[in-house]
Amino acid sequence: MSDINATRLPIWGIGCDPCVGDDVTAVLTRGEA
């Protein structure tokens, strides 16, 4: 996990539905892991 993810996750959680935020988290995790 990078600082970029830590910054984006709250934004997605507030700006989008939780289910969408989970999908984004999975994509970001795959990209870095």
Swiss-Prot record:
More about this protein: The typical symptoms of amatoxin poisoning are gastro-intestinal distress beginning 6-12 hours after ingestion, a remission phase lasting 12-24 hours, and progressive loss of liver function culminating in death within 3-5 days. One of the few effective treatments is liver transplantation.
Proregion positions: 1-10, 19-33
Cysteines joined through disulfide linkages: none
Bilayer-spanning residue ranges: none
Family to which the UniProt record says this protein belongs: Belongs to the MSDIN fungal toxin family.
Signal sequence interval, chain numbering: none
Entry PTM: Processed by the macrocyclase-peptidase enzyme POPB to yield a toxic cyclic decapeptide. POPB first removes 10 residues from the N-terminus. Conformational trapping of the remaining peptide forces the enzyme to release this intermediate rather than proceed to macrocyclization. The enzyme rebinds the remaining peptide in a different conformation and catalyzes macrocyclization of the N-terminal 8 residues.
Name of a matching Pfam family: Amanitin
Location in chain, cross-link 2'-cysteinyl-6'-hydroxytryptophan sulfoxide (Trp-Cys): 12-16
Keyword Membrane: no
Species of provenance: Amanita pallidorosea
GO molecular function, one term: toxin activity
Entry keyword set: Thioether bond, Toxin
Keyword 4Fe-4S on entry: no
Protein's UniProt name: Beta-amanitin proprotein
Sites of the Cyclopeptide (Ile-Pro) crosslink: 11-18
Job of this protein: Toxin belonging to the bicyclic octapeptides amatoxins that acts by binding non-competitively to RNA polymerase II and greatly slowing the elongation of transcripts from target promoters.
Domain of life the protein comes from: Eukaryota
